Amino acid sequence: MITRTHERAPFSNQGTHAALIFTVLAITAVTAHTLVAQQNVTYELPLSAENIHWGFYDASLEPVVTIRSGDRVYFENLLARGLERLRLAGISERRFLPSMLNVEEQETVRVGSHPLNGPVYVEGAEVGDVLEVRLIDIGFLADYGVSGFLPGGGTLPMDFPSAALRAFEIDTINGTITMTGVEGIEIPARPFFGSIGVAPPLLRGRINSTAPGYHVGNLDNKDLVEGTTLFMPVHVDGALLSIGDGHAAQGDGEVTGTAIEASLYGTIEVILHKDRTLQWPRAETPTHYISMGLDPDLDEAARMATREMVRFLVEDKGMEPGDAYILCSVALNLRITQLVDGTKGVHGMLSKDLFR
């Protein structure tokens, strides 16, 4: 459902009383940053149950909007697993936006953990095409987040048999994050969406949003920040693009299984390429080319990320395969994307400064 009416919340770290005042004001107030986010936007998807599907990618889903190549879409997203963990971590319900409560209260099928905006139908997109998603703008819908671990979860399941949660306060003016109950730590805010993907082939059915795959999905790649572009292969007509799983910050690996889960807004620009093909996703930042490897085996994920960069250098830069392989050995930086989603991720980053 598309509408031009939005909630916007100014942010404060001045305590519960201030948070209550700002939550009330959020019904009509608009921050300068979100005003910028609305500029040159073709479609807007405010946070609502109608614009969310919870925890899956599926080619049989009805799209919430149809766009053309070159259109921009503004959207608002609820953090993974909804509001319950925020409550358990000590965030007052008075700080929740009415739209957040509305989404949580609606009866809906929850296959996985991530409320995803969409799907977005892209006119003209066909199987074998490439979808380019430009991350134009990413910001905070609320100035708090949560992180923690489940019993026996994450990278060290035997070390931490219990569970723990921590709330985080986000200073949206200065771009810093503090961990409640822990003094002397300040984390740089680096918001990004952990899950961006298209529908899998119709015969594949419904895919849980937890693990990434050929449809992309839950990459949890902390380098896909504002200003980055993601390229994905299309598997069904219209592509059926979905996005969600907002993170305020994350380390390489996401070792507990969660980043700082946060509610974000974003603006994307979608470009359809009929003259390109891809087997696996790629990305590009202003400074780097990014290849990706996804596999339950970390070694195989690393091989895939390397192989995909070699393929990029051969196909896009015109290099001989052997030379491309050598260049990867001396200049490609492999990073662990995440270790905790079943299908592990490794991404390779190659500096654009190498090319004159």
Question: Where are the language model's segments positioned?
Answer:
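Short, Lys/Arg- and Gly-enriched loop/turn segments at beta-strand edges
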Residues: A80-S92, I138-G148, G238-A248, Q338-L339
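Intrinsically disordered, low-complexity linker/loop segments enriched in Gly/Pro
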Residues: H114-P115, D137-L224
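Bacterial N-terminal signal peptides
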Residues: A19-T31
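N-terminal secretory signal peptides that target proteins for export/translocation
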Residues: M1-H17
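Conserved mixed alpha/beta catalytic, RNA-binding, or beta-rich assembly cores of soluble enzyme
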Residues: F193, L202-G213, K222, T228-P296
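Boundary at the C-terminal end of the N-terminal hydrophobic targeting segment
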Residues: A32-A37
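Short, basic/aromatic beta-hairpin or loop at an interaction surface
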Residues: Q39-H53, R94-V111, V198-T210
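Alpha/propeptide regions of enzymes that mature by internal proteolysis
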Residues: V41-T42, P46-I52, S60-Y74, L79, ...
